[in-house]
Amino acid sequence: MVDKPKHRAADGRALDDKGNPVVDEKGKPILDKNGNPLKPDYTKDFSFKLGGRIQVDSQINWNGNGPYGTDLANGVGFRRARIYTEGVMFRDYEYRFEYDWARNNGGTQGITDAYLKYIAIPNFAVTVGQQNEGKSMESVMSNNYLTFIERSLPNNAFIEAGPNSKYQIGITAETWNKFALDKDWAMPYTVRGGLTTESVGAPGPGNSSGNSQGQTNNAGGTNSNGTNINRNAFSGDTSYQVVGRGTLAPFYQKDVGVLHTGVWGSWRSVNNNYNTDGTLRTGGWAYQSAPNTDVDRTNWINTGNLSSAKVCAVTIKGTCTAYKPVKQVNNVAMFGAELAGAYGPVHLSAEYMQAQIAGYGYSGSDTLQGFSVQGGVFLTGETRPYDVKKGTWDRLVPNNSFVGGSGWGAFEIAGRYDLMDMNTLHINGGSINTGTLAVNWYLTPRIRFMTDWVHVFSVNNNNSLRAAGGKCAFPAQGSGAAIGCFSGLSPDIWEMAVRLDY
């Protein structure tokens, strides 16, 4: 969070030089004892903060019973290595810029956040620039606060490692408040929505403006938005989406508990850019996910690009003069539902999400979907904090941090079950379900050791309705049709991680 200047309260209201709000909660000026309006203190209109995070993961696998090429890699690597600057300028504007030097989530771009936010109106903000698109309770939450080393399968497939990074250029508006029932019990809510396009330099089918297919364009060279080379050389327009999320906590009492509900949805127009011979140049759409792993991010489920090359429709004198699409995704509609709660040391959460694919070669039955259920308990008695402004979990502060020998920090045990199904009538993306057990040690609010044991219960990448897409080829490649090689495998994965932010 940005360190707010001292002239502004937590709810955004300006303060005078003594720290008193100059307007009430309805925006009406507050008068001093002489009947004059209190004046804001503008002596500290600017703030600056520099910070970052270092996250290191390790992975050991037991899955040597599969075909050649399906073994997951053991190893150690940086999950994230970020540095950021943020603050407030001219009293009413918040800024943030963050760069990830590791960017090990399936993307190559380094920029995560790069935005300007207007915060002058209490409980309201407008953000312009690259920002989190705002889908899912788990994805809106900072990865500094995650219970598990990796987010759930559907979250990873649809949002985190989807066809477009969740950090997208756009404009969003948000509001938050609470229905105060008494001094201790309130019903906080959030509403956020806007228009987003694509990420800065995002690779893959989700980026219609770069040569994500690695093909040569008609100008004789390759084009990638990641290097910002000649966007007009047949690179295509950017896609766009309308997205929104709303949350309500029917029960919330700080340091006691919360009951959270939420829904979100989006509609994205997908661009498909073709060469003159009907082959796909850029664009399209695809979903994929690894089995809750990071060091080895092989995609065990993968739809492949849902747009394919066109076929010849009209031939004149042996030359094709017109083409027609066979498989072409034109738009994707997504929906998600959230339910979470915490009381005392126990916390639970569940999410469901789906993506409806529409276009040539697809029907109303082509809906990809997944869900996750997770829960945990703090053995040292802490209650999981709730962020009322974002409608998600907040940073845990141990009752007794492991500092100077005065305490042992906080200990947490947790479990999760998740499932992702991307097999439909016309899509053979595969299905997978896993279980995860976790033990976390929070030494301080900003230093944490994590260990997860992941078991893959089943993988089914052989859809009989489209058998060709599920066949096993050698060597197995997670990004191609060879995902069929993973069918029937049930590996165990041990992961360990260190999380530090400052």
Where are these regions (language model features)?
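Outer-membrane beta-barrel pore domains
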Residues: P21-V22, T43, Y115, G265, ...
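Short linear proline/tyrosine/threonine-rich motifs used for host-factor recruitment
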Residues: G12-V23, G27-L31, P37, C320, ...
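Extracellular/lumenal/periplasmic "stalk" regions immediately C-terminal to a signal peptide or transmembrane helix
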Residues: M1-K4, R8, D17
